[in-house]
A protein has these predicted regions:
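Short, small-residue-biased leader/transition segments that mark boundaries at the very start
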Residues: 1-4
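Alpha-helical transmembrane segments and membrane-interface helix-loop junctions
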Residues: 6-184
């Protein structure tokens, strides 16, 4: 169960938001990480069936691509939570904690969040058109539900936006010298 927070101050509200968002993205990230094992197992099965039994499956081959996409799309916010995205750090590490907090806060508000909103807005018609026709694979024997996979574009941007809220709050706390009591 997600933690329950009481809201009686700015810091407490911030801590609550951080905890809820970080917990959500942690669970999603850990969940989709198991897809890497599934990719390996399905790939091995596809190879064995193809070369040992001369049997092929378009659906199995497509499922590998679907799982790969899910790992990246649903794991992006988890990666941001753990600060594991590629980052060119020329100056940031030399700044004081306060300055780092302000840089991260402004970067989140001025770069990450607008990009997430742009992705959601610009992909909305693309995804809704796919839903409208219940798009499925173009290949005979392929997987149905391409529209579900395309929906992860919006979900990814939404999860990144939420994680951006958590990051912005953490950065603002750092910039203001506030040390919240969060376990995430």
């Amino acid at each position: 169960a997600l933690p329950i927070c009481t809201m009686n101050s700015f810091v407490t509200i911030g801590q609550c938001a951080i905890t809820l968002i970080d917990t959500l993205n942690e669970r999603i990230g850990r969940g989709v990480s198991w897809l890497t094992l599934a990719i390996v197992l399905v790939t091995v099965a596809v190879v064995i069936f193809r070369y040992c039994f001369n049997l092929g499956s378009i659906a199995a081959q497509e499922s590998i691509s679907y799982m790969h996409a899910l790992i990246f799309m649903l794991g992006a916010a988890y990666t941001l939570k753990h600060n594991d995205h590629v980052r060119v750090d020329i100056f940031h590490h030399r700044f004081s904690k306060t300055t780092q907090g302000w840089v991260d806060f402004l970067g989140t508000l001025l770069l990450l969040m607008p990009v997430c909103l742009f992705i959601i807005i610009s992909s909305w018609d693309y995804v809704s058109d796919s839903w409208e026709i219940q798009e499925s694979s173009r290949n005979s024997g392929g997987l149905p539900g391409v529209y579900l996979l395309k929906s992860t574009i919006i979900i990814m941007a939404g999860l990144l936006f939420l994680q951006g809220i958590s990051l912005a709050i953490k950065s603002l706390f750092s910039a203001l010298g506030i040390t919240p009591n969060t376990e995430s």
